């Protein structure tokens, strides 16, 4: 089963291809989807746990050698450092929404994704059908119970809606069908309006796709997620 980082794969070819973004832009109109064969009818109940932002963990200096080992066989030792920086940078951009859409329309070569948590959330706690967001001090930002929606979309995401009124930015969640067991990370988006979650490239949350990893991840998980992120996506871009 191919286990790709969905948002990253949309723009990697743009920066690695010698042909430039002119051709790659066409590819982004039909973004790759994750294999859903192992996903249950109620995905949210399969990912219980506490999650932190993925890319600040991936970019820690103690994991640099894992990156180099993963990228060297594909791009060569002389390019491994630069490629690692590129891979991380592709998902650690600050702008999103209309600001990002305007920026990347005028400068396609700078295209990247914001994969951080928004709305003042430092950690997400998934517990059955309840999603809770905690800030950096451990205080609750929100906590709601969610129901599964029957919502089809081109990205293959699984949609949930809060059962509480006035849920604001956390009214809707859209999850890529990743789990810690299959892809060693999660990808998801959230918004007040469902329409903002239908496209990676339009709306108030364009070029944003939160990426998370279990707070209690171990060394083996970090090795696996880096190998997945580096090896499969670089191979796909060749």
Annotated model-derived regions:
Residues 16-20:
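C-terminal motif of bacterial Sec signal peptides marking the signal peptidase cleavage site
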Residues 1-10:
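Positively charged n-region of N-terminal signal peptides that target proteins for export
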Residues 35-36, 52-129, 172-180:
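Short, solvent-exposed loop/hinge segments that bridge or flank secondary-structure elements
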Residues 34-52:
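N-terminal helix-cap/turn-to-beta initiation motif at the start of protein domains
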Residues 12-15, 45:
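Processing junctions and N-termini across compartments
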Residues 27-34:
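Low-complexity, Pro/Thr/Ser/Glu-rich flexible segments characteristic
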Residues 32, 105-238:
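Calycin-type beta-barrel ligand-binding domains and close structural analogs
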Residues 22-25:
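Bacterial signal peptide processing site
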